[in-house]
Amino acid sequence: MAKNIQAIRGMNDYLPGETAIWQRIEGTLKNVLGSYGYSEIRLPIVEQTPLFKRAIGEVTDVVEKEMYTFEDRNGDSLTLRPEGTAGCVRAGIEHGLLYNQEQRLWYIGPMFRHERPQKGRYRQFHQLGAEVFGLQGPDIDAELIMLTARWWRALGIAEHVSLELNSIGSLEARANYRDALVAFLEQHQETLDEDCKRRMYTNPLRVLDSKNPDVQALLNDASALGDYLDDDSREHFAGLCKLLDAAGIAYTVNQRLVRGLDYYNRTVFEWVTNSLGSQGTVCAGGRYDGLVEQLGGRATPAVGFAMGLERLVLLVQAVNPEFIASPVVDIYLVAAGAQTQSAAMTLAERLRDEMPGVKLMTNHGGGNFKKQFARADKWGARIALVLGESEVADGTVVVKDLRSGEQTAVAQDSVAAHLRTLLG
């Protein structure tokens, strides 16, 4: 017997019972994006490797440890995308979408990182991201955060997420702080773990978000990044906080929040939860005003965020179980008798024409009434249409409410109107 081939570790199948809740959540997210004027952009999952090295940073964990990189048959180095912003910027430059233009874009799809798989963290995972180009004020930063807050309300999870904010300033401000932080860490190397010692010279700001409690205690004595902010960044951040206060959005300023990708500047933010164990970040983003120019375009202000859909689905299921998927089927058509199948299929097609939004499944594979009604229950149908030889002969169909058990014989010509009443 041939050996079964299974999915790659950390790359999961999502089966019909799971995808239904995904579809409902994604529909909610997309509706809110549309209400803010965002347009979808669809991007390749494979890009040239230098794109990510230049955008994310050569000495980040993503580039050093986590990317799926390979040579194609032409000898070109390609990478499965580990995040979406770099590809979105590349597309904007390539197709002339960014220079002297305002763009509000969103994308959705799989990303890939070679990490240790655990609940809420996978090697293939799905993100929804939104990016805004051409606007540099704190007002658009605030609107992006307001958009995400509207998502949480729509999904019934607003009480289970909290917003953390910081400003990491300009490139020059971070360089000055970096020097001061390295000097401080060099004096306390005995407290640092091996990972922090490695980061101390390659990417010292990442020491700030170390999970090591001894390192976090040590950092209480270090100077804060906020002490080194340039005046423009300080003013920008104050403006953002004022707008969020006016909108009634609660937040915590976390001066150790730096984000793991090198392209960020000024505003950074995360929505976090305590309901998913160690995988607490649900949505994160910030401003990246230098990235378009860094990737070959003209200087363009930009801000955006990305959200992990696996974690969002887990969170919705954990804290709002009433947010359930729509049933696969609204109506199940039961056909009994050798001469009824053709009539049943004809009636089903007519109802699909007259009721475009209805989910109607016709029974196939035969079976007596008991088996067919069991199938209707399996698919979650609210209504069964019963068509036997006598109904075919007199042009009627029996409409049965599967919740109340009530049933009525209705003329086939008027059954669509009757169904609309029942379905609301």
From Swiss-Prot:
Q: Which InterPro entries match?
A: aa-tRNA-synth_II, aa-tRNA-synth_II/BPL/LPL, Anticodon-bd, Anticodon-bd_dom_sf, His-tRNA-ligase, HisRS-like_core, HisRS/HisZ, HisRS_anticodon
EC top class named in words = ligase
Q: Does the keyword Cytoplasm apply?
A: yes
GO BP, sorted A to Z: histidyl-tRNA aminoacylation
Q: What is its main location?
A: cytoplasm
A molecular-function term among this protein's GO annotations: ATP binding
Which reactions are catalysed by this chain?
Answer: tRNA(His) + L-histidine + ATP = L-histidyl-tRNA(His) + AMP + diphosphate + H(+)
* Subcellular location as annotated: Cytoplasm
Q: Which UniProt keywords apply?
A: Aminoacyl-tRNA synthetase, ATP-binding, Cytoplasm, Ligase, Nucleotide-binding, Protein biosynthesis
CDD domains for this protein: HisRS-like_core, HisRS_anticodon
Enzyme Commission numbers on file? 6.1.1.21
Please give the GO cellular component terms listed in this UniProt entry.
Answer: cytoplasm
Asked whether the keyword Nucleotide-binding is assigned, the reply is: yes
Q: How would you summarize the oligomeric state and partners of this protein?
A: Homodimer.
Q: Which family would the database say this protein is a member of?
A: Belongs to the class-II aminoacyl-tRNA synthetase family.
- Protein name, as recorded: Histidine--tRNA ligase
